[in-house]
């Protein structure tokens, strides 16, 4: 399996999960501006939408969209929490959490909009605060991770998104439970290794 990624982008979540499952994989960095990979390949021939992540499951077989990729990797692992049974409430809860990660992604993604004016930046910060307040309400003090005692793909995705605030020097640590979740995820060996492999550490 090959992961096409951009350092620090949402593809970092898939990178963390690949490290968690402990099966062989390879990495290929993508320049999303030029749509070229580090080996000089035309990325649009791999993913016509030009976004990361994408995984090449086998030659010519490519999967895109982070939520789908995270679930696919989990389904092909030996980790029970990564692959709740299809049709179960646990699977629906994982999909629900990944769906909310998409909402977080949209809000935080505004931080990277080109030519962001002061007014636009204020609006982005307000959107982030609104989503983070919603996220905070989802997290229970009695749970180790988002969905319970087990680490899941949703934890990795949410933690990566919150890390974008660090990149942009936006303090969101007052969202106490959410920030504690991020810190817990980033302390995992799988996350530390992914940061090193992407040149972020």
Question: How would you label these PLM feature ranges?
Answer:
Residues 53-56, 146, 192:
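Short beta-strand(s) of the beta-wing in winged-helix/HTH DNA-binding folds
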Residues 1-122:
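GST-like domain detector, emphasizing the conserved glutathione-binding G-site
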Residues 89, 96-97, 101-189:
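GST-like fold's C-terminal all-alpha helical module
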Residues 27, 174, 194-195:
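A generic structural-conservation signal
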Residues 68, 189-190:
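Alpha-helix/helix-capping structural signal
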Residues 196-201:
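Terminal-tail/helix-coil boundary detector
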Residues 74, 161-162, 195:
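Active-site-flanking alpha-helical
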């Amino acid at each position: 399996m090959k992961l096409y990624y951009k350092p620090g982008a949402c593809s970092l979540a898939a990178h963390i999960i690949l490290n968690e499952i402990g099966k062989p994989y390879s990495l290929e960095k993508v320049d999303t501006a030029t749509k070229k990979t580090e080996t000089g390949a035309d990325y649009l021939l791999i993913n016509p939408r030009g976004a990361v992540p994408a995984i090449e499951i086998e030659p010519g077989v490519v999967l895109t969209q982070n939520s789908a990729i995270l679930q696919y990797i989990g389904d092909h692992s030996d980790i029970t929490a990564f692959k709740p049974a299809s049709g179960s409430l646990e699977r629906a809860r994982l999909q629900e959490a990944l769906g909310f990660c998409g909402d977080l992604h949209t809000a935080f993604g505004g931080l990277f909009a080109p030519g962001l004016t002061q007014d636009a930046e204020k609006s982005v910060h307000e959107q982030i605060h609104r989503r983070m307040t919603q996220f905070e309400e989802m997290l229970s003090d009695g749970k180790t991770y988002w969905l319970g005692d087990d680490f899941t793909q949703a934890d990795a995705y949410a933690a990566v998104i919150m890390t974008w605030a660090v990149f942009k020097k936006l303090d969101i640590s007052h969202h106490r439970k959410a920030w504690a979740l991020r810190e817990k995820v980033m302390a995992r060996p799988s996350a530390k290794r992914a940061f090193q492999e992407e040149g972020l550490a």
